[in-house]
Amino acid sequence: MLFIILFTSFIGSVRAQSGSDSLVMSYMQEMGIPLTYNNKIELLMTGREKFINLFEAIRHARHHIHLEYFNFRNDSIANTLFDLLAEKAKEGVEVRAMFDAFGNWSNNQPLKKRHLQAIKERGIEIVKFDPFTFPYINHAMHRDHRKIVVIDGKTGYTGGMNIADYYINGLPKIGKWHDIHMRIEGDAVRYLQGIFLTMWNRETGQHIGGPAYFPKLPQYPDSVSEEIAIVDRTPKETPRSISHAYAASIEAAQKNIQIVNPYFVPTKSIRKAIKKALKKGTKVEIMIPEVSDIPFTPEASFHIVHKLMKRGAKIYLFKGGFHHSKVMMVDSTFCTVGTANLNSRSLRYDYETNAFIFDPSTTNQLNGMFERDKQNSTLLTPEIWKQRSGWKKFVGWVGNLLTPFL
């Protein structure tokens, strides 16, 4: 509540800057979130695009490769990745990989002790973040949900995809998997590197750092350079950073907002910002998947989007598989791509990273994806809502009460 009051006051004081992108950039500077101006971005719109691009970048690594993922699924994609990493380690490239213990445990094809030992024997440093020890409840929250790769301190990746072949092949129960990842070259990579090294050094007790990990970077011409803010969520240090950045962006919107998120059970501050945007006439479109890989959450999501539909939001139920993308586009001028779901788990508990990109061209690419995916979606209407069973509506109502824990 205090954030909304402060941000509303802030918006009023800088409204003369006009554009929503300018408002949010000013907000981020006020909050101490660094803006970087010398960047090149490539959106990777499918799993195949991501892994082809990532593997090629790994082949060209010369000094170090850093990977931080929620999980590495023990399948053909992970095997190809670790083969590549082993080759680079043999060449003398430093290779460090980190994955979340819960993310691995919840994976139906986890990396087991024998797999980790084999990986280490090939010259790859691999670490499990926050292993489960007694009392286990102490480890239930604050999981590392980030997906970060940094190569030679010059090239970075982040977005919604872990390491698994279902990003290419899909899954039997939910069909084709849709997701968004991105490649960054330029100054924003320094912040991805800093996030990784902070976590790595904390978990291992090592002291990796120095100029070799933060090399001098080329300057890109203004015609291609893009402005990026890396917004990182660390539970104790920056617990509300991504939630506030989302709410600020929604609050600043002047024309339209498009959101795609797989587990749409947002915090009260984000819901309040959306309602306020609708009240002032901003067009709000939200896309959620019709099917999900997680039980219970979809019913809570349906309950929430139905409430927003009644206030004027357009809700699209994607039926072409599972849309796992975590993106938002505002006024066709700026967007965010990252790891954070719009649920309490991501916004209140886990380690997450989102890139806020102030560039119309990149934003328009995502707008185009949204418009294409509308063709494979059902618009939620009062009639469709009435067709839902009473049981599903009840489960959604209960889920809405439990959103602080989802």
Enumerate the predicted regions with their spans:
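Charged, low-complexity intrinsically disordered terminal segments
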Residues: 10-406
